[in-house]
Amino acid sequence: MRAVVQRVLSASVAAGSSRHSEIGRGLLVLLGVAQGDTELEAEWMSRKIVQLRIFDDAAGRMNLPVRDTGGDILLVSQFTLYGDASRGNRPGFSGSADFEKARPLYEKAVRSIEQHLGKPVMTGWYGEAMQVALINDGPVTLILDTPQRL
């Protein structure tokens, strides 16, 4: 499982003209599910995202996790995180899990993040084309990968 985690002042996602999710200060997380991922990877990634200490404490050091700041999380599925363009210019996505296998793991990650965060998580719409907007804070952007063997 791979996540691109961005500290934001605000973020939103839209699909079509009628569906919209947004947060204020917090984390925008783009989440990709790889071939072979299981609920173990979803749980590990969920804990890691919520526990990341990337918000400033009173001394101005990155020392606080999102849950200690009252911040929110916007979680957006993104299968292209496992795109491979090492040969040619058109990326292949064979490293991404199939739609039917990835969706339950994405949903597991949503539930697990909500449990660890202690409040609802805003999400995009799995498998749909979306428009994502954000105002970075810092900017602070991290790329997380689950360990090879859990």
Swiss-Prot record:
It holds the Pfam family Tyr_Deacylase. GO terms for molecular function: D-tyrosyl-tRNA(Tyr) deacylase activity; Gly-tRNA(Ala) deacylase activity; Ser(Gly)-tRNA(Ala) hydrolase activity; tRNA binding. It catalyses: glycyl-tRNA(Ala) + H2O = tRNA(Ala) + glycine + H(+); a D-aminoacyl-tRNA + H2O = a tRNA + a D-alpha-amino acid + H(+). Its EC number is 3.1.1.96. A motif (Gly-cisPro motif, important for rejection of L-amino acids) lies at residues 138-139. It is found in: Cytoplasm. Its main location: cytoplasm. Homodimer. A Gly-cisPro motif from one monomer fits into the active site of the other monomer to allow specific chiral rejection of L-amino acids. An aminoacyl-tRNA editing enzyme that deacylates mischarged D-aminoacyl-tRNAs. Also deacylates mischarged glycyl-tRNA(Ala), protecting cells against glycine mischarging by AlaRS. Acts via tRNA-based rather than protein-based catalysis; rejects L-amino acids rather than detecting D-amino acids in the active site. By recycling D-aminoacyl-tRNA to D-amino acids and free tRNA molecules, this enzyme counteracts the toxicity associated with the formation of D-aminoacyl-tRNA entities in vivo and helps enforce protein L-homochirality. This is D-aminoacyl-tRNA deacylase. The gene is dtd.
